[in-house]
């Protein structure tokens, strides 16, 4: 998805944003109404706004001067870390934090999607710096490594790979002993 978003072939991303704004996504509720119909009142009606939203996502979330493609960077010396960077960008915008990066990279290569795979031997750990105020990481994708326990004040959303696919308590464990969010009054409660 991120690669397609950055590429924006034939205006795909801008058109998708426009569909969201118009409430014509094809995602309907039980009454047959588009779930985004009537939403985004401020943004609706501005004819140029889909393109402006796309440019804003590129700049503020993906740290990309323009569109392009996705670079997946194996951070040498930092086991399990794959940095995500837009073509032409200097900073990483995301981190995939998983156990087996070699197998994951082989899957990406086999997919032949155009994602560039490279190595970065000098970058610091992105995961260790995730709570720093000047971190460039906006997107964190992970797997069972999150069940090991960590604290973060920056997480507002989590993407999980292969968690909770079988019966069991993985999701409960993840939030029971895994992630501690900032919480009320800096309590770091789960």
Map each language-model feature to its residues.
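SF2 helicase motor core recognition
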Residues: 141-156, 174-178
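Residue-level marker of positions within ordered structural domains that often coincide
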Residues: 6, 154, 163, 179-180
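Residue-level detector of solvent-exposed, low-hydrophobicity positions
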Residues: 19, 104, 142, 153, ...
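Conserved C-terminal RecA-like helicase domain
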Residues: 1-140, 165-166, 184-189
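Solvent-exposed loop/turn segments at secondary-structure junctions
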Residues: 147-148, 164-166
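Conserved SF2 helicase motif VI
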Residues: 158, 165-187
């Amino acid at each position: 998805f991120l690669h397609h978003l950055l590429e924006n072939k034939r205006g795909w991303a801008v058109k998708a944003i426009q569909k969201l704004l118009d409430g014509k996504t094809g995602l309907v509720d039980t009454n047959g109404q588009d779930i985004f119909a009537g939403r985004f009142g401020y943004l609706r009606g501005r004819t140029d706004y889909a393109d402006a939203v796309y440019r804003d996502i590129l700049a503020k979330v993906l740290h990309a001067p323009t569109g392009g493609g996705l670079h997946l960077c194996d951070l040498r010396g930092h086991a399990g870390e794959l940095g995500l960077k837009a073509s032409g960008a200097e900073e990483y915008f995301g981190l995939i934090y998983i156990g087996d990066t070699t197998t994951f990279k082989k899957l990406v290569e086999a997919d032949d999607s155009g994602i560039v795979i490279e190595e970065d031997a000098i970058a610091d750990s992105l995961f260790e710096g995730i709570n720093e105020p000047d971190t460039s990481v906006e997107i964190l994708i992970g797997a069972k490594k999150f069940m090991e326990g960590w604290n973060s004040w920056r997480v507002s959303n989590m993407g999980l790979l292969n968690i909770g696919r079988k019966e069991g308590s993985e999701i409960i464990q993840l939030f029971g002993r895994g992630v501690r969010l900032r919480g009320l009054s800096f309590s770091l409660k789960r």
